[in-house]
Amino acid sequence: SVARGALLTFNGEVEKKLARGLNLSAEAEVRMKEMTNFRPGVNHLKLIEVGTKLSYKICDYVKVGGGYFYRAYLKDGKESTGWENYWEHRHIVVVEAVASYKVSNWKFSLRVRPELTIRTDSICELEKVRNFAELRTRLQVEYDFASKPFEIFAYTEMFNTLNAIDPNETLNEVYRLNWEKNPGYSVPWSGQYVNNVRAAVGFSYRFDKRNSIKVYYRFDYDIGRDIHLNKNYANNFKEFTVTRENEFSHMLGIGYAYSF
């Protein structure tokens, strides 16, 4: 496992009530690189994300919605970019359902969110999925101090792949491209898997009916699977490796929300 330094992220949200139970929101996020690596004069952006979401409250216990997000990652330079930093772009489509239940000042909720991430960069589709689907499941608890404009919350979230590449199928294709006989070797890390586990704790403060802020700490444990094909000459893959790339990171988040 690889430990990453603390990250800093800023969130903003504007929400408009269109009709009874129907809301439209616009969201933005800016995430910085590890604070431990801060150096003056260096671009510390990690990603920028903007999007919009439409939600509808069916009843007191159930809300559904969907939206679109655009995400841009700032990557370190490589030889093909002249060692200049460059952007990678993603288009993300989400749908979600949230079930919630209140007990006194406590509120418990479960959110299920299928998510499709569309890549725009050049990739080898034997190594990576261009249109990557995953299922996010979040369990959250909140406590509202009724006499004060203050709320604390905690949640845990799990990400499951829905269409990850099966390394064994890739392996078969590699042997076919090499005109070799498949010796029956199988990769132990195949099929769908949990690729991220997330937990957070924080608080929110309401200035008035329209304005609020939140501050939170988040822990991420990423469970990656890297498929790599070594090319000895054009279109002839000779070596095939599958490795796990596990890493965890800490994040401090600050958010602002406005509703009207």
Question: What is each model feature region?
Answer:
Residues R39-V103:
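Hydrophobic/aromatic-rich structural module bridging two neighboring secondary-structure elements via a short loop
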Residues F10-G12, V50-T52, V95-A97, T137-L139, ...:
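Membrane-embedded beta-strands of outer-membrane beta-barrel proteins
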Residues S1-G67:
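Start-of-domain marker
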Residues A97, N246-F260:
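Outer-membrane beta-barrel "beta-signal"
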Residues K107, R111-A234, Y258-F260:
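Outer-membrane beta-barrel transmembrane domain signature
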Residues M35, N43, A72-I92, V112-D121, ...:
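Surface-exposed acidic loop/strand-edge motifs in secreted or periplasmic proteins
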Residues L18-A26, D60-V62, H91, S104-V112, ...:
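Outer-envelope beta-barrel architecture signal
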